[in-house]
Amino acid sequence: MSFLLTNDQIEQFKVDGFLVVDNLVDEKTIAQLHTRFDRLFQGDFETGIRPDEVNWQEHDSDPELTRQICNAWKSDHCVAATVLREDLGRALAELGGWPGTRIVQDNVLSKPPGARPLGYHQDNAYLAWYTPREMLTCWIALDDTSEDSGTLEFVRGSHRWHGQQTPEGAFHDPPDYKRAMTTAAQQENLIPEVIHVEIPRGGGSFHHGWTWHGSGVNRSHNWRRALVLHGMRSDTQFVPEHLNH
C-alpha cells in the first residue's frame, strides 16, 4: 500500500504539530510485525545483527515496563521493509518542508496490560549531535488504541512554544510522566490541550520534533504495540564534537 498526504493535512500539521491518519499498514503486515516483535524481544534477530539499543528482553526484564528496541530495522527484514518505505519518507519530507528524508532510528514498542508510562518529552531536545536540529516522526499503531490502553498523547500546538527543554529525569516509568511538559506549559502561561491518539490498528500519526508527547499506564486488558520511524532531513550534517553525547 502507498500513503499520500493531502494539502489540508499538511496545513493541519503546521497548526497542531501532529497529524492522526488511517491506513498506514495493512492487516498482513500487522500480523507479520506481531510475530517479529515477539521474536525480537526474545533475542531472535533475523539478520544476525543486534539492534543498537535493546531495553527489554524476555525473562531478564521488568514485565511491567514498556518494551523498547531501537533500530530493529538492522535486525529484522519486516521491520526494515516498513520503516524504510519510500512513501513514509516522502510524507515526512512534505510535512517538514525538507528536500528528502533519512532515517534516524526506529522504535519497536510493546506495552502489555499494566505497563507503566513513558515520560513526556520533545524529540528535538536530544539532537545536539546533528544540524539542522530537526526530526519528524511517524508512529504506526499495530493494535487498536484508546486512552485506557496508554496510547500516545500529544499537546496540541506545543511545537510553537518558546521554551526548549533539556532532557532530564527518567524516560521509562517516571514518577510523574507529565511533569516536564506541565512545567513547560506553566512557563508559557498556557493550559496544555492533551490529545490521545485513539485509532484502529494500521493507522497512526506524524509529529513535529518539538511537539510534547508521552504515554500513560496501560489500564486496559489489551496489548498496545507500535512501530515508530524517526526521520531527519536529507541534507543533515553531523556535529562531530557532540557525537558521543
Question: What residue spans do the PLM features occupy?
Answer:
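Short, conserved beta-strand element in jelly-roll/cupin
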Residues: W129-E147, E198-I199, H230-R233
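Non-heme Fe(II)-dependent double-stranded beta-helix
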Residues: S2-V15, D22-Y120, Y126-W129, H242
